[in-house]
Swiss-Prot record:
Catalytic activity: a ubiquinone + NADH + 5 H(+)(in) = a ubiquinol + NAD(+) + 4 H(+)(out)
Major place of residence: mitochondrion
UniProt entry keywords in alphabetical sequence: Electron transport, Membrane, Mitochondrion, Mitochondrion inner membrane, NAD, Respiratory chain, Translocase, Transmembrane, Transmembrane helix, Transport, Ubiquinone
Job description of the protein: Core subunit of the mitochondrial membrane respiratory chain NADH dehydrogenase (Complex I) that is believed to belong to the minimal assembly required for catalysis. Complex I functions in the transfer of electrons from NADH to the respiratory chain. The immediate electron acceptor for the enzyme is believed to be ubiquinone.
Entry's localization field: Mitochondrion inner membrane
Protein's recorded name: NADH-ubiquinone oxidoreductase chain 2
A GO-annotated cellular component: plastid
Gene responsible for this protein: ND2
Length: 488
C-alpha cells in the first residue's frame, strides 16, 4: 500500500503545486503594498521547478511498481506504459515552459494564469494517460480541453489569438460531444465503463443483435473524437488556423502534449476486442490521408507556423502507421515515433520563438540567417533534416522503424505511401534550408542573442537528434517493454 501511495504521489504533488501557485499569484499580484508586481516569470520558474520535481518523483516511483495496479476506485491504472507516457508528457511540459520566459518579456505578457493553465492541463493529461474507465477518461479530456481553449486565446490584444480560441472552443466542444456520445452508446450496450469489463465483454462473450451494433457505433464515435483531437485527416481542418493564431508557446504545447495523452488513450481503449481489424482500417486510411495532405499542403505555405502545423498533421499520419499494424512491433514503433516527434518539435518551436524576437513570421524572412546567426541556422537545418527523415538523424530512425513495422505486418501499400510522402516532404524542409543559406533576404535582420533557457534547451534536443543513432538500443528496449505491458 505504501509503495502504491508513492507511485501515485507525483499526481498528488503537481495538483497541490498548481493550486499553491494559483493562490500565490492571486494574493501577490493584487498586493497594493508591493505595487501590483508582475508574477508571470516568478510563477513560471516555480512551475518549471514543480514539473521537474514531478518528473523526479515519477522516475523514483517507477522501480517500486513491478506489476500493474489499479487505484482510486479502479478508475486509474499504473503500469510501465503509464510511466513512459507520463515522463514524455512532463518532458514536453518542461520544454514548453522553459522556452516561455523570453516570450513573456518580448510580448510584455504578465498574466501568471498562463503558467497555471499549462500546469492544470498537464495534471489532466497525467490522469488521461492513467485513466482506466470511460468516465475518468472523458472528464480528464474535458479538463484538458477547457485549459487549451483559454490558452489559445490568452493573448487578448491579438485578434488572431481571440479567433483561435473561439474556433477551438466551438470545434473542440463538437468533438467532445462526439466522444461522449460514443461512450454513452458503449455504456448503453454493455452496462460497463471500466476497461477491464469492456475487454472481457468484447473478447470473452458472443455479442449479437442490437448490442453488437451499439458497441460498434460507440467505438466508431470514440475513434472519430480521438482522431479529431490528434488532428488526423479528415478531422484536421481546425489545426492550421488555431496553431497560427495561438501564442507560439501554446502552439508548441498543442503540437505535442495532447497527442501524447490521446495516443495513450487510443492504445488503452482499442487494444482489446473483436473490432480491432475495423479500427485498424480506419486508422489505415486516416494515416494515408494525413501523410498525403501533410506533404502536399505544406508545399504551398508561406508562414513558418502554418508549415509546422501541416508538418504536424503529416507526422500524425506516420505515427498512426504503428497502430494500423496491430502488432507489438507496431505499438513499439508508435511509441518510438511519438518520443522522437515530441523532442524534435520542442526543438523546432524553440527556434521559432528565437526568431520571433525579430518578428520573423514568413519563410522569406529567413533569408541569409546563416550569415546573421550561423549557429541558429545550423540547428534549424538539423531539425528540418530530422523531420524529413534524412539519415543518420533521429527522424530517420523513427520513420525507418515505422515503415519496418508496416512491412512486417504486410501493409506494403502503407509503407510505400509513407516513403513517397517522406520524399515529397523533403522538398519544403530543404527549401527552408536553402532559404537560410543561399537566398538574399528582402530586408536584412540583425538577430538578437537567445536567452540562456532556449540555448540550453536547443543544445539538449539538438544533441539528441544528432547523436541518437549512435546508441538507440535503450529507447528500443524501453518501448518494447511498454508495448508488452499493455497486454499484461
Amino acid at each position: 500500500m505504501f509503495n502504491l501511495f508513492l507511485a501515485v504521489f507525483p499526481e498528488i504533488f503537481i495538483i497541490n503545486a498548481t493550486f499553491i501557485l494559483l493562490i500565490h499569484g492571486v494574493v501577490f499580484s493584487t498586493s497594493k503594498k508591493d505595487d501590483y508586481p508582475p508574477l508571470v516569470s516568478n510563477v513560471g520558474w516555480l512551475g518549471l521547478l514543480s514539473v521537474l520535481i514531478t518528473l523526479l518523483l515519477l522516475a523514483a516511483g517507477a522501480p517500486l511498481l513491478t506489476i500493474a495496479h489499479l487505484f482510486w476506485n479502479n478508475f486509474f491504472r499504473r503500469d510501465n506504459f503509464t510511466y513512459f507516457c507520463q515522463i514524455l508528457l512532463l518532458l514536453s511540459t518542461a520544454g514548453t515552459i522553459s522556452m516561455c520566459f523570453d516570450f513573456f518579456e518580448q510580448e510584455r505578457f504578465d498574466a501568471f494564469e498562463f503558467i497555471v493553465l499549462i500546469l492544470l492541463s498537464t495534471c489532466s493529461m497525467l490522469f488521461m494517460i492513467s485513466a482506466y474507465d470511460l468516465i475518468a477518461m472523458y472528464l480528464a479530456i474535458e479538463l484538458q480541453s477547457l485549459c487549451f481553449y483559454v490558452l489559445a486565446a490568452s493573448k487578448r490584444k491579438s485578434e488572431f489569438s481571440t479567433e483561435a480560441g473561439l474556433k477551438y472552443l466551438i470545434l473542440g466542444a463538437f468533438s467532445s460531444g462526439i466522444l461522449l456520445f460514443g461512450c454513452s452508446m458503449i455504456y448503453g450496450s454493455t452496462g460497463a465503463t471500466h476497461f477491464d469489463q469492456l475487454a472481457k465483454i468484447l473478447t470473452g462473450y458472443e455479442i449479437t443483435g442490437a448490442r453488437s451494433s451499439g458497441i460498434f457505433m460507440g467505438i466508431l464515435f470514440i475513434a472519430v473524437g480521438f482522431l479529431f483531437k490528434i488532428t488526423a485527416v479528415p478531422f484536421h481542418m481546425w489545426a492550421p488556423d488555431i496553431y497560427e493564431g495561438s501564442p507560439t508557446p501554446v502552439t508548441a504545447f498543442l503540437s505535442i502534449a495532447p497527442k501524447i495523452s490521446i495516443f495513450a488513450n487510443i492504445l488503452r481503449v482499442f487494444i482489446y476486442g473483436s473490432y480491432g481489424a475495423t479500427l485498424q482500417q480506419i486508422f489505415f486510411f486516416c494515416s494515408i490521408a494525413s501523410m498525403i495532405l501533410g506533404a502536399l499542403a505544406a508545399m504551398a505555405q508561406t508562414k513558418v507556423k502554418r508549415l509546422l502545423a501541416y508538418s504536424s498533421i503529416g507526422h500524425v499520419g506516420y505515427i498512426c502507421i504503428g497502430f494500423s499494424c496491430g502488432t507489438i512491433e507496431g505499438i513499439q514503433s508508435l511509441l518510438i515515433g511519438l518520443f522522437i516527434y515530441a523532442l524534435t518539435t520542442i526543438n523546432a518551436f524553440a527556434i521559432v520563438l528565437a526568431l520571433r524576437q525579430t518578428r520573423v513570421k514568413y519563410i522569406a524572412d529567413l533569408g541569409a540567417l546563416a550569415k546573421t546567426n550561423p549557429i541558429l541556422a545550423i540547428t534549424f537545418s538539423i531539425t528540418m533534416f530530422s523531420y524529413a527523415g534524412i539519415p543518420p538523424l533521429a527522424g530517420f530512425c523513427s520513420k525507418f522503424y515505422l515503415f519496418f513495422a508496416a512491412l512486417g505486418c504486410g501493409a506494403y501499400f502503407l509503407a510505400s505511401v509513407g516513403v513517397v510522402t517522406s520524399v515529397i516532404g523533403c522538398f519544403y524542409y530543404i527549401r527552408l534550408v536553402k532559404r537560410m543559406f543561399f537566398d538574399t533576404p528582402r530586408t536584412w535582420i540583425l538577430y538578437e542573442p537567445m536567452d540562456r533557457n532556449k540555448s540550453l534547451l536547443l543544445a539538449m534536443t539538438s544533441s539528441f537528434i544528432t547523436l541518437f543513432f549512435l546508441y538507440p538500443s535503450p529507447l528500443f528496449s524501453v518501448t518494447h517493454q511498454m508495448a508488452l505491458s499493455l497486454y499484461l
